[in-house]
């Protein structure tokens, strides 16, 4: 980890740079896979599963027998943990339900919104170095609450053609309708365009590597919506001298073990804490089974000391982290001033891991500074709001002349006439 003390503002942009994930050079490769899936459907996906995931499959769909078997393979303690997490995620997201109100903007003119679920959604759950069954809950639970009629899930199988049982169990608990053995670009293409087995969906959710990210970008240009721009995962700890270095180091490492391109940052007002955290990270790193991954991630991570909390908050808002842990004496007051972050964890007993798994908030969040403009996944991500308006005779008399005047000045005579012909009948 790099130690930085009292950087000049002119250095901030360089200091806050993320590990680069360049998808531009991948587009030709990714486009070729997408085109194969569009033209050859299941056959193309099966061939690519054999090529990329080394899985010789005869069909893509997960069977009822596989789902029943998965339930017997998951440890009872893990089942209980998944059910608890599902309950909290459900409680938090159910509280986000939209209640539209009719508004009379002026006499005779009534406007309102209605929330409608996206009918078909696709969830992508990576395989990779860890089975992300928690992401199944984070995406499927709000989709179910929203009322999505078809919830499709794609996830890569192992070399034996099996999906991790915890992923299958979580999918059943959360209410996923159909599950398919497909990973990477071919999974995204399958959900974007449909195959003989995989239905076409209207919006695709879920994390993935640079190939998945590039695929989502390409299919979203004109064919299907996606959740948000994605990049490597990241955490920032914002701390003062009261922070526990053991906790801070543990939080930084919990992010670093995600992947070699993840980033962990400490911004603090205390040089003593900076040094203590460095030593504690080195100590805890030696104990991690995923030490090699975390070690590579830490190469792009930084421990930064600034002159005061004012500057720490300003630097934090400039960084706009995916996850922000505030471990200061006055963390509630500090939190009030945070305007750019995906999800914020307050106080010494609120690790990022809580939001990753079971507190109830969603862990599908904007990365790479997109927290300045994007929200994380919520119930709103799975719905559309349709606007309605009803104009009665009194309303047409009230707003008709204004519409005519505005349309005439924009030289849109047909727009004006649509009002004029109605006014003549009132």
Language-model regions, residue ranges each:
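Conserved NAD(P)+-binding/catalytic subdomain of aldehyde/semialdehyde dehydrogenases
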Residues: 175-263
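Short acidic-hydrophobic, aromatic-tinged amphipathic segments that line or gate anion-handling sites
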Residues: 1-7, 178-183, 303-308
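A glycine- and small/hydrophobic-rich beta-loop-beta segment
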Residues: 258, 266-341
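Flexible, glycine/charged-enriched surface loops at secondary-structure junctions
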Residues: 98-105, 225, 262-267, 287-297, ...
């Amino acid at each position: 980890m790099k130690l930085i003390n009292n950087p000049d503002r002119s250095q901030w942009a360089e200091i806050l740079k993320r590990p680069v994930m360049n998808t531009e050079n991948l587009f030709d490769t990714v486009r070729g896979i997408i085109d194969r899936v569009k033209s050859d459907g299941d056959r193309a996906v099966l061939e690519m599963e054999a090529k990329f995931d080394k899985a010789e499959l005869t069909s893509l769909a997960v069977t009822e027998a596989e789902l029943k078997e998965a339930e017997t393979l998951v440890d009872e303690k893990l089942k209980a943990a998944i059910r608890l997490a599902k309950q909290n995620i459900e409680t938090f997201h159910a509280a986000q339900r939209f209640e539209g109100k009719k508004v009379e903007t002026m006499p005779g003119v009534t406007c309102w919104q209605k929330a409608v679920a996206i009918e078909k959604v696709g969830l992508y759950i990576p395989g990779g170095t860890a089975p992300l069954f928690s992401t199944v809950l984070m995406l499927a639970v709000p989709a179910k609450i929203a009322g999505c009629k078809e919830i499709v899930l794609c996830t890569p199988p192992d070399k034996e053609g099996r999906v991790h049982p915890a992923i299958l169990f979580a999918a059943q608990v959360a209410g996923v309708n159909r599950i398919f053995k497909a990973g990477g670009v071919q999974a995204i293409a399958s959900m974007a365009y449909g195959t003989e087995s995989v239905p076409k969906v209207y919006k695709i959710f879920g994390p993935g590597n640079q190939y998945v990210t590039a695929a989502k970008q390409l299919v979203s240009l004109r064919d299907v919506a996606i959740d948000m721009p994605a990049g490597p995962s990241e955490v920032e700890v914002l701390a003062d001298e009261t922070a526990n270095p053991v906790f801070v180091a543990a939080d930084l490492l919990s992010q670093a073990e995600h992947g070699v391109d993840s980033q962990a940052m400490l911004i603090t007002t205390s040089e003593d804490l900076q040094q203590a955290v460095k030593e504690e990270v080195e100590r805890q790193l030696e104990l991690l089974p995923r030490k090699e991954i975390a070690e590579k991630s830490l190469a792009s991570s930084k421990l930064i000391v600034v002159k005061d909390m004012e500057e720490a908050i300003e630097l934090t808002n400039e960084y706009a982290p995916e996850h922000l842990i505030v471990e200061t004496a006055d963390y509630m007051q500090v939190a009030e001033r945070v305007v750019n972050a995906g999800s914020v964890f307050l106080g010494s007993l609120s690790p990022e891991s809580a939001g990753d798994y079971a507190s109830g908030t969603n862990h599908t969040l904007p990365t790479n500074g997109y927290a300045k403009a994007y929200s994380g996944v919520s119930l709103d991500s799975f719905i559309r709001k349709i606007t309605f308006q009803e104009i009665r005779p009194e309303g047409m008399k009230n707003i008709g002349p204004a519409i005519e005047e505005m349309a005439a000045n924009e030289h849109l005579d047909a727009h004006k006439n649509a009002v004029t012909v109605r006014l003549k009948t009132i």
